[in-house]
Each structure stands twice: as C-alpha cells, then as structure tokens.
Amino acid sequence: MSTWANLGLQDSASPLMEQLIFFHDHALLILVMITVLVGYLMFMLFFNNYVNRFLLHGQLIEMIWTILPAIILLFIALPSLRLLYLLDEINEPSVTLKSIGHQWYWSYEYSDFNNIEFDSYMIPTNELMTDGFRLLDVDNRVVLPMNSQIRILVTAADVIHSWTVPALGVKVDGTPGRLNQTNFFINRPGLFYGQCSEICGANHSFMPIVIESVPVNYFIKWISSNNS
C-alpha cells in the first residue's frame, strides 16, 4: 500500500504490475532524455551570438527532427502494445471471483463454490482497531490463493464503479448491466489495499477493497469453513 512520502509506485505483487513498473521507468527515461535535449537546444538558441538572416530552410535538420521522433515513438509504442495485449489476455483461471459495486460498498461471490457470498463495508474510524488503517480496512476481506490464476468479473448494481488494486495492476470498471473481466496472479502473501476509482456519489471515498493473499492450503481451509 502507499505510505507517507512515497514518491514511486506501490511494490508489485503480480508479474503484470512488475512489467507495468518497468514500462513506466522505460518511458520516464526517454522523457528525461527528451527534456534535457530540448532544454539544451533552447539554452543554446537564446544565449548565442550567431544570427543568419538568409537561412530559409535546412533539409538535413528537418529530416532529423522528423525521423528521430518517429524512432522514439516506436521505442515507446512497441512495449506499450505488448503490455496491452498481456493485460487483456485471460488464462485458464483457478478461481473466479465476482465483484458487484454498490453505493457505497462491494459485494463478492465465489462462483466456483456454493453459498459463498458476502458484502464488504469500510470499518468506520470509531470502530477501527489500533493497528487498522483509516478509510482502508473492511469488515470482510477478499481471501484469494497466491500463485494461482484469478479471474475477476466486475459489474455494478446502481452507478458506474471501478474495482482497483494498484499493487496487482488491476483496474476494472463496474458498469450496470454489463460484465467486465480481467485476470491477475498474486505472487506473494499479504494484504493488498485498493479503492473505488470512479466517482460514484457522496461516499465514493468510503468503499475500499482489501485482498488477503494466502497459500493454497489455507484458502482451501477457508473455503471449507465458509461452505459448512
């Protein structure tokens, strides 16, 4: 989760989020290089004493400033397209989770198992434990197995919501009457926090998401205890 004075992205907990961070750093490096080059050229333009009143065109420089940006755009576009297709790919899931957005809480259904569904509300500040996180903790966490392909189906019951967990690189809009899906792979145990990322009304800020990633054997025990 994000902490105080955190200037970077959250630590990744999935392979796709790791790739997104690499692409962010790659694009940022290119932007810094462009900024330095343009800044240097502007400095040299403003602070030199050379003026040529008869220079009408420069074919070589025009070719350079046409071809060079095209090459730079290719270096950004190709990794971006690769990531776009990777994020859109749905692998054979081990577990399917359905998330339904409401004003202002989430409902969850484990589609592969019988009778496992619950609502997840934010814990109010006056009911929060001393080790809890204000405006982020919920009464019912989503329990998912680590090192397994997870598919999530997202929809909404009233207005548009957005199910977002930054550490997993997941952001899916929940639209009434429509079912959106994506998949992710959690590669370590822990708690991962997210929030609704689509303005959905007065209490939009108060519908957090908490995922508890556990080993597969603990997940099976949790499923068995909730099925009985």
UniProtKB/Swiss-Prot annotation:
InterPro entries noted in UniProt: CcO_II (IPR045187), CcO_II-like_C (IPR002429), CcO_II_C (IPR034210), Copper_CuA (IPR001505), Cupredoxin (IPR008972), Cyt_c_oxidase_su2 (IPR014222), Cyt_c_oxidase_su2_TM_dom (IPR011759), Cyt_c_oxidase_su2_TM_sf (IPR036257)
Positions bound to Mg(2+): E198
Catalysed reaction equations from the record: 4 Fe(II)-[cytochrome c] + O2 + 8 H(+)(in) = 4 Fe(III)-[cytochrome c] + 2 H2O + 4 H(+)(out)
Annotated positions binding Cu cation A1: H161, C196, C200, M207
Compartmental location: Mitochondrion inner membrane
Coiled-coil intervals, chain numbering: none
One Pfam family here: COX2
One cellular component (GO) term of this entry: respiratory chain complex IV
Topological category with respect to the lipid bilayer: Multi-pass membrane protein
The record's free-text note on cofactor binding: Binds a dinuclear copper A center per subunit.
Side Mitochondrial matrix, residues: 49-62
Annotated GO biological process: ATP synthesis coupled electron transport; mitochondrial electron transport, cytochrome c to oxygen
Segments in the Mitochondrial intermembrane topological domain: 1-26, 83-228
Required cofactor names: Cu cation
Annotated keywords: Copper, Electron transport, Magnesium, Membrane, Metal-binding, Mitochondrion, Mitochondrion inner membrane, Respiratory chain, Translocase, Transmembrane, Transmembrane helix, Transport
Annotated EC: 7.1.1.9
Residues that coordinate or bind Cu cation A2: C196, E198, C200, H204
Outcome following mutation: G39S: In strain: Mysore
TM spans (from-to): 27-48, 63-82
Keyword Repeat found: no
GO molecular function: copper ion binding; cytochrome-c oxidase activity
UniProt similarity note: Belongs to the cytochrome c oxidase subunit 2 family.
PANTHER family (alphabetical): CYTOCHROME C OXIDASE SUBUNIT 2, CYTOCHROME C OXIDASE, SUBUNIT II
Function: Component of the cytochrome c oxidase, the last enzyme in the mitochondrial electron transport chain which drives oxidative phosphorylation. The respiratory chain contains 3 multisubunit complexes succinate dehydrogenase (complex II, CII), ubiquinol-cytochrome c oxidoreductase (cytochrome b-c1 complex, complex III, CIII) and cytochrome c oxidase (complex IV, CIV), that cooperate to transfer electrons derived from NADH and succinate to molecular oxygen, creating an electrochemical gradient over the inner membrane that drives transmembrane transport and the ATP synthase.
Subunit structure: Component of the cytochrome c oxidase (complex IV, CIV), a multisubunit enzyme composed of a catalytic core of 3 subunits and several supernumerary subunits. The complex exists as a monomer or a dimer and forms supercomplexes (SCs) in the inner mitochondrial membrane with ubiquinol-cytochrome c oxidoreductase (cytochrome b-c1 complex, complex III, CIII).
Name of the protein described by the UniProt record: Cytochrome c oxidase subunit 2
